[in-house]
Amino acid sequence: VMRLSDNPVLSTVSWFYIWLFRGTPVLVQLLLWFNLALFFPTLGAGPLSVDTNDLIKPFVAALLALALNEAAYMAEVVRAGILAVDEGQTEAAHALGMSQGQTMRRIVLPQAMRVIIPPTGNETITMLKTTSLVLVVGAGDLLTRTSAIAAREFTTIEMLLVASVWYLVLTSVASYGQYHLERRFARGTSAGSQASVGRRILANLRPGRVEGGVR
């Protein structure tokens, strides 16, 4: 939303943030956060200062790296969704006396969600798989646990397959949720009123049905 601001300071800051985090590899960001103590041994000032190594644990480093990187991508997804809504509707809402916040909540966002949800689902699935990178800092994710078992039991291939199955389960659950969210926000539109491909195929395979719908 800051990218759409008329304030040049806000729009510039948001542009720089998105440019920086989208333009550098996630693994590099992860390693920089994990080794932050090399640049800043302590954080804070005076009696409020804390040792960076005590604060930036592997889990915290992974959380910061993945969250900030994903936020940069999602910022562009949300911006695209808002821009997809006809500007005339915003002007009409303002003409009816709605404030900027009311227009965003009641007019813009409900329509923008139809554009936002599909790429958000894709980003969620990508993020689930990207968590495997935290193996390099030992943050205790799924791949870290399976790799530890593989090293102990000498079952590298087997544990990689187990991890792959779990990733498939997680991404399938995310895809299922995305599908139902898309259907919910597509109600009342041409996309929401269309029957699914499977239902149309089943309808065409009913006994006695011929071309044109005439027996």
Where are these regions (language model features)?
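Transmembrane alpha-helices and adjacent helix-loop boundaries
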Residues: 1-215
